[in-house]
């Protein structure tokens, strides 16, 4: 390459798709080739037809040394015009070392994909964090969250992706950094926050959500009360039903009824006095935990429990989602732990098998 350049080869040449020689060198990952081309006048800010720059390609392929060379010669304005940050590319390619380099260089971890890029993804993802979570890449997720990445920016919540994977560490990490446990899916919305549907068979995951302020009371909200529930011809979850489905309609489905007693018993640890509707009651009465559930429902809750609920309500869900706020409360450590339901934090206790 050096000989060709010395003989007059054009370092600014481009292929039919506008891919520059520098971009192809970045794709190969040879830092000496990248440096040589730059010395002969190659421009790091010339995009190919797709909008990608050499820095994007180096980040996507995980070529750390080439990336180091390209960072100082790439304009932020050119990156903004491209509609995608090299942060996205490093996260998508699962290259935490490249990601760390870019973060240290000052790239914005909350740069969102431009609409013209977003439309190529079925889920219309926007953030680099979403790419890292989708890959199950804990190292990259930790780097992004530590650098200030916001976990609630995408149409499909990052927490939803982690819950679907059943990845305890990923879910815990997102919750500690402010992931919203009370998000609602845009498709087939339920009457209660959507995250619960991924935890019905897993007590560890269920308590994670409840500890971080999941709106449990909505699960006991039913307009029918003690009256007979109207029959729905399209009862249950399907790809076509779009309605305000109540929790009682979900947990009483034939393939979930056996979980109802365990799920409701756990939920009662997070609410004041609640009333259960006739439909839910009829199913619970057939469960082994019914006597314990009935005792809780028909007796006053302890003052200690009520005080915990009141403190949590005064704190608000935003502070519960970010427990660092607890450090500002003039309360003894044991009381803080009680308010945060630490006795029910099974994951922190090292319990990693949550199937009922």
From Swiss-Prot:
A Pfam short name: SOCS_box
ANK repeat positions: 17-46, 50-81, 82-111, 124-153, 154-183, 185-218
Entry's Gene Ontology BP terms: intracellular signal transduction; protein ubiquitination
Keywords attached to this entry: ANK repeat, ATP-binding, Cell projection, Cilium, Coiled coil, Cytoplasm, Cytoskeleton, Dynein, Microtubule, Motor protein, Nucleotide-binding, Repeat, Ubl conjugation pathway
Domain of life of the native organism: Eukaryota
Main subcellular localisation: cytoplasm
Xref: InterPro entries: Ankyrin_rpt (IPR002110), Ankyrin_rpt-contain_sf (IPR036770), SOCS_box (IPR001496), SOCS_box-like_dom_sf (IPR036036)
Entry's Gene Ontology cellular component terms: cilium; cytoplasm; dynein complex; microtubule
Positions of the SOCS box domain: 290-345
Subcellular locations according to the entry: Cytoplasm, Cytoskeleton, Cilium axoneme
Keyword field contains Repeat: yes
Pathway(s) it belongs to: Protein modification; protein ubiquitination
Cross-referenced Gene3D superfamilies: Ankyrin repeat-containing domain (1.25.40.20), SOCS box (1.10.750.20)
GO molecular function terms attached to this record: ATP binding
UniProt keyword annotation of Coiled coil present: yes
Record text on subunit structure and interactions: Consists of at least two heavy chains and a number of intermediate and light chains.
Family according to the record: Belongs to the dynein heavy chain family.
Domain notes: Dynein heavy chains probably consist of an N-terminal stem (which binds cargo and interacts with other dynein components), and the head or motor domain. The motor contains six tandemly-linked AAA domains in the head, which form a ring. A stalk-like structure (formed by two of the coiled coil domains) protrudes between AAA 4 and AAA 5 and terminates in a microtubule-binding site. A seventh domain may also contribute to this ring; it is not clear whether the N-terminus or the C-terminus forms this extra domain. The SOCS box domain mediates the interaction with the Elongin BC complex, an adapter module in different E3 ubiquitin-protein ligase complexes.
Function: Force generating protein of respiratory cilia. Produces force towards the minus ends of microtubules. Dynein has ATPase activity; the force-producing power stroke is thought to occur on release of ADP. Involved in sperm motility; implicated in sperm flagellar assembly.
Protein name: Dynein axonemal heavy chain 12
């Amino acid at each position: 390459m050096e000989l060709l350049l010395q003989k007059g080869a054009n370092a600014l040449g481009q292929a039919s798709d506008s891919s520059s020689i520098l971009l192809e060198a970045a794709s190969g990952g040879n830092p000496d080739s990248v440096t040589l081309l730059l010395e002969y006048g190659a421009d790091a800010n010339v995009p190919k037809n797709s909008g990608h720059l050499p820095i994007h390609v180096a980040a996507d392929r995980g070529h750390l040394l080439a990336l180091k060379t390209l960072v100082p010669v790439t304009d932020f304005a050119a990156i903004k015009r491209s509609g995608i940050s090299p942060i996205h590319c490093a996260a998508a390619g699962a290259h935490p070392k490249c990601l760390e380099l870019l973060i240290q260089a000052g790239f914005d971890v909350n740069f969102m994909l431009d609409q013209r890029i977003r439309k190529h993804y079925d889920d219309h993802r926007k953030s680099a964090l979403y790419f890292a979570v989708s890959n199950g890449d804990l190292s990259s997720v930790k780097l992004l969250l530590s650098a200030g990445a916001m976990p609630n920016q995408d149409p499909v919540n990052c927490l939803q992706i982690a819950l679907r994977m059943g990845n305890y560490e990923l879910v815990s990490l997102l919750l500690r950094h402010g992931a919203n446990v009370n998000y609602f899916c845009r498709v087939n919305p339920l009457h209660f926050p959507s995250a619960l549907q991924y935890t019905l068979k897993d007590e560890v995951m269920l308590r994670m959500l409840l500890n971080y302020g999941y709106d449990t009371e909505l699960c006991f909200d039913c307009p029918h009360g003690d009256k007979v529930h109207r029959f729905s011809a399209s009862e249950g979850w399907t790809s076509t039903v779009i309605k305000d489905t109540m929790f009682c309609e979900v947990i009483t489905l034939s393939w979930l009824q056996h979980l109802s007693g365990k799920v409701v018993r756990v939920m009662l640890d997070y609410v004041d006095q609640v009333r259960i509707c006739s439909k839910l009651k009829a199913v619970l009465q057939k469960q082994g935990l019914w006597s314990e559930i009935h005792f809780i429902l028909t007796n006053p809750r302890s003052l200690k429990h009520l005080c915990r609920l009141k403190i949590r309500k005064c704190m608000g869900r935003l502070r519960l989602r970010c427990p660092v706020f607890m450090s500002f409360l003039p309360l003894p450590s044991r009381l803080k732990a009680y308010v945060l339901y630490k006795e029910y934090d099974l994951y922190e206790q090292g319990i990693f098998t949550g199937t009922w």
